[in-house]
From Swiss-Prot:
Protein name: Ankyrin repeat, SAM and basic leucine zipper domain-containing protein 1
Signal peptide residues on this chain, from the entry's feature table: none
Gene Ontology terms: biological process: cell differentiation; male meiotic nuclear division; regulatory ncRNA-mediated gene silencing; spermatogenesis; transposable element silencing
Main location: cytoplasm
Function recorded in the entry: Plays a central role during spermatogenesis by repressing transposable elements and preventing their mobilization, which is essential for the germline integrity. Acts via the piRNA metabolic process, which mediates the repression of transposable elements during meiosis by forming complexes composed of piRNAs and Piwi proteins and governs the methylation and subsequent repression of transposons. Its association with pi-bodies suggests a participation in the primary piRNAs metabolic process.
Record-listed Phosphoserine modification sites: 17-18, 20
Compartment(s): Cytoplasm
This protein's record includes keyword Flavoprotein: no
Amino acid sequence: MAAGAMRGLAVAGGGESSDSDDDGWEIGYLDRAAQKLRGPLPTEEKNETFKKALTTGDISLVQELLDSGISVDTSFRYGWTPLMYAANVANVEMVQVLLDRGANASFSKDKQTILISACSARGTEEQILKCVDLLLSRNADPNMACRRLMTPVMYAARNGHPQVVALLVAHGADVNAQDENGYTALTWAARQGHKHVVLKLLELGANKMIQTKDGKTPSEIAKRNKHVEIFNFLSLTLNPLEGKLQQLTKEETICKLLTTESDKEKDHIFSSYTAFGDLEIFLHGLGLEHMTDLLKERDITLRHLLTMRKDEFAKNGITSRDQQKILAALKELEVEEIKFGELPEVAKLEISGDEFLNFLLKLSKQCGHLITAVQNIITELPVNSHKIVLEWASPRNFTSVCEELVSNVEDLSEEVCKLKDLIQKLQNERENDPTQIPLIEEVSTWNSRILKRTAITVCGFGFVLFICKLTLQRK
C-alpha cells in the first residue's frame, strides 16, 4: 500500500488534518514488522511495529504486542490512539480486539472523538455500522461534537449512511443539533444529495424548517446544490414520514430500523434508487420496504394494493403482519362506509321511512366526502410537471380515469334524479289518496329538502370532477 494512501487513512474525520505531511505512519521501516515478534523490542520500536500492525490489519501481531506490555491506549503522533485509527478505517475486528483489551471508547483529541472517526470512516456502511455499534455499547457519547460543532450523526448523514444515522439516534443522538454554521444532519444530507438519508431523518423526527446561520432551510440548500428531487420532497406541505419513529423506545427503534439489515443486497438496492414511485412512498411510510420487490415482481400497483381483498393478500404472499399494517392505514384513510347491501331491501318496500331517510343522508354525506377529496387533490396538484416528486405514469391514464369518473357521476346524477321524481310521484299520490292520513307538513318539507340536497351534492361532485379533468388535460 502506498504511503500516500496510508496518510489518507490517518486524516481525522471531518477533514481536520495536520499541516505536516509526516503523520507518523512510516511504511517501509522494518521488514520484520509484518512477521511475528522474534524477541523483545525497544519501546520506540514497539510503537513503530504497533503502528504497522494497525495499518496492515494484523490482528495477531497487535494481540502479541499488547501481551508484551504495550498500552492499548498508547498515544501516537498528534495524540491519536490505536482505537481511533482502527475506527477511522472501519476495521471491525481490530476495534473489537482493542475494546476487549480495555481501550477507551470515549477518548477524544482536540474534540475529535473515536465515534466521529468511525462515522467519517472510509468503508462500507456495514463495516461502519458495526464499528459504531461497538463504540456505543462501550458508552461512547453520540452527542459529543468536534471543534466545528459537528456531531457523529452529522458525519453519518453527510457521508450517506442511513442505518448509522438511525443507530445513533436510537442511542440518544440529537437529530436536530446544529453545527457552527447552523447545519443539522438533515441539512448535510440535503446538501450532499443523500435522499435515502433525508427520508430516514424525517422518519426520526428531523425538523425540516430549521435554518442555517445564513437563513437557509434544508430544502433551499438542496436546491442550491441542484438536488431537485430532494428539494421537491422537502418542499411538500405535508410529510407522511415525519416523526414516525419518535415515540418508540431505544430498543424498539433499533429493532425496527435494523431488522432488515441481514438482507444486505436488498437494502443496498433500495437505498440506491434513483426515484420514488407512489408504491415505494406508501410502503416506506408504513415500514414495509421489504415488500417492494415482491409487489413489483407481481406487477401490483398501489391502486391494486389498496383495493385487495383479504384472500388476495395471502395469495400474493403478503404476511398477516404486513396485511394488518396495510389495512390499518386504509382504515385511517377511508370515509364512512355506506352499506350498499341494504339496497335490495328497498325494493321489497319493507324498509321504514327512518331507514330510507338514513340511507339518503349517508349517500349525501359520502358524496360530500368525495367532493372534499377531489378539491384537496386539485389544491395540492402541482401546476408545473417539474414539481412532481413521484414517478407518474402517462397523463393519458389519469385523464381516461377522470373521464370514467365524470361518466359515472353523470349516471349517478341521472339515477338520483329518477329516484327524486319517483319519490315525488309517490308523495303526490299519497297526498291525493283520501284513505291516507295527511303527512305532517314539516316532515314532508324536510324529506324534500334532503332529496334536493342529495341531488345538488351529486351534481356538484360531477362539476368538480369535470374541472379536475380539464385541469389534467391542460397539463
